[in-house]
C-alpha cells in the first residue's frame, strides 16, 4: 500500500473519464441503469474491474456506490420493485440474465458487509456452513478448508484453539475477519467490501486493509468506502460517483492527485459530501 497526497487544485486540461482497468477485466459494466421502482438510481454506468486488483468506489451518501456493488451479485433480486438494465459481464457472461443461477453467482461473487455478521454458531461452523451449501466434502477436507480460510483471513493463529467457541464471542475486528474467512471458504473469484471498516477501531481497520492487500493476489476486489485515505491506500483504481452517475474513473493516484472533474476535486478535498 502507498500513501497518496490529495491534490488541492484541478489541472486546466479536462480529459474524459476513463472506463478501462489497469489490466484484464474480470467484471465489465456496460450502459447499466438501475431503478428502485420509478426512481432512476444509477444512470448509464460504464466501467471495468481489473482482475486481481482493488477498485474503490467513493462518493457522498446516496450517490449509488453501494447500489452498484449489490448489482454485482444480484442482491437486489431479494427486494421487489428493483430492476437493472444493461450488461454486467463476469468473464464475458452477463450476470443480469434472468436465467442465471443466483446461488452459483453468489458463490463466485462474495460480499462482506459494513457491520460484522457472524452466524450464531461456532467459529468452525461459521466457515463450514457456506461450504456445505455448494459442496459435499469429507470431515478431513472440511477441516482443511476451514483452516485455509481462517489463515487466508489472518485469523487462524487467534482462534485455532477455540474453534468450537461462538463466533459472536470474538471482537468486532475478529468478527469481520471471520466474515471474510467465511466468504473466501467457498472459493469466490470476486469479493465485494461494503464499508468493511466503518464500525471498527483503527487497529482493526489496519488489519483489514493489510488483508485486502494480500487477498488481491487471489481475488478481484471492489470496495465502497467513505474514507478517502483508505481508498488511496488500498486501491489501484478509483471510481467517483455522484447522484447516480459515474463522474470519473481511473488510476487511484491520478484521481487523488490530478482529477479531471471539478466535482471529484471538490469531494476529495472535503468541499461537499
From Swiss-Prot:
EC number from the UniProt entry: 7.3.2.1
Main location: membrane
One GO biological process term: phosphate ion transmembrane transport
GO CC entries: plasma membrane
Molecular-function GO terms, alphabetical: ATP binding; ATP hydrolysis activity; ATPase-coupled phosphate ion transmembrane transporter activity
Domain ABC transporter, residue spans: 27-268
Role of this protein: Part of the ABC transporter complex PstSACB involved in phosphate import. Responsible for energy coupling to the transport system.
Family named by the database record: Belongs to the ABC transporter superfamily. Phosphate importer (TC 3.A.1.7) family.
Annotated protein name in UniProt: Phosphate import ATP-binding protein PstB
Species whose genome carries this gene: Rhodopseudomonas palustris (strain ATCC BAA-98 / CGA009)
Primary gene name: pstB
